[in-house]
Design a protein with these regions (language model features):
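A hydrophobic alpha-helix adjacent to the NAD(P)-binding/active-site core of NAD(P)-dependent oxidoreductases
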Residues: 40, 82-85, 128, 132
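N-terminal Rossmann NAD(P)H-binding glycine-rich loop of SDR-like oxidoreductase domains
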Residues: 2-25
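NAD(P)-cofactor binding segment of oxidoreductase domains
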Residues: 77-105, 142
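Active-site helix of classical SDR
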Residues: 135
């Protein structure tokens, strides 16, 4: 019997990569607020009761929380939405992980560092610049302090999946060049 992974916020580039990577060896439930693939089902992970119910009914062995607003310009202009999604919703994942006694994987960002050095390691102190980085770092702190079994991964620049999923800087430039 395959182990089960519940992946919240799976509609972006990283989620698609996780689906491809883990789909053959694990039973997956992939959710997102933007159902843009046939293998996704709807979930707003900011809604604790819905999130808890969905993970519980799936009987997950692991909880992966990928979801976040990652468009830096959006995050700077929409601070309340950014913190509700990137910080407060992470608290939902923590509570669910603890309640169901399952490990939590939380995706953060290498952007929690200020760029003052060429390379950073695990012993460098974060100095997030901007609301996106601060909201993700606040999520990290909450996970570290409140879940025994957790893994925090700090992703860097991701590119790929084409214009449908890539909302980052490079794709924005490409879009502007087309006009």
């Amino acid at each position: 019997m395959k182990k089960k992974i519940y992946i919240a916020g799976c509609g972006g580039m990283l989620g698609e990569a996780f689906h491809k990577c883990f789909g053959s060896t694990y039973e997956l439930k992939c959710t997102d607020i933007d159902v843009n693939e046939t293998w996704l089902s709807y979930l707003d992970f900011r809604d604790y009761e819905s999130y808890l119910r969905d993970v519980s009914e799936f009987k997950s062995d692991y909880l992966f929380h990928l979801g976040a607003y990652t468009d830096l310009e959006f995050c700077e202009l929409n601070q309340d939405d950014t913190y509700a999604t990137n910080t407060l919703a992470v608290e939902n994942a923590v509570y669910i992980s603890n309640k169901l006694n399952i490990p939590l994987l939380y995706i953060s960002t290498a952007g929690i560092f200020d760029g003052a050095k060429d390379t950073f390691d695990d012993w460098d102190l974060p100095n997030p610049m901007g609301h996106y980085a601060r909201s993700k770092y606040a999520g990290e702190i909450f996970v570290q302090n409140n879940v025994d079994r957790h893994l925090i991964c700090r992703a860097g620049w991701m590119m790929g999946s084409g214009p449908k999923k890539d909302k980052k800087f490079v794709q924005k430039i490409m879009k502007q060049l087309k006009y």
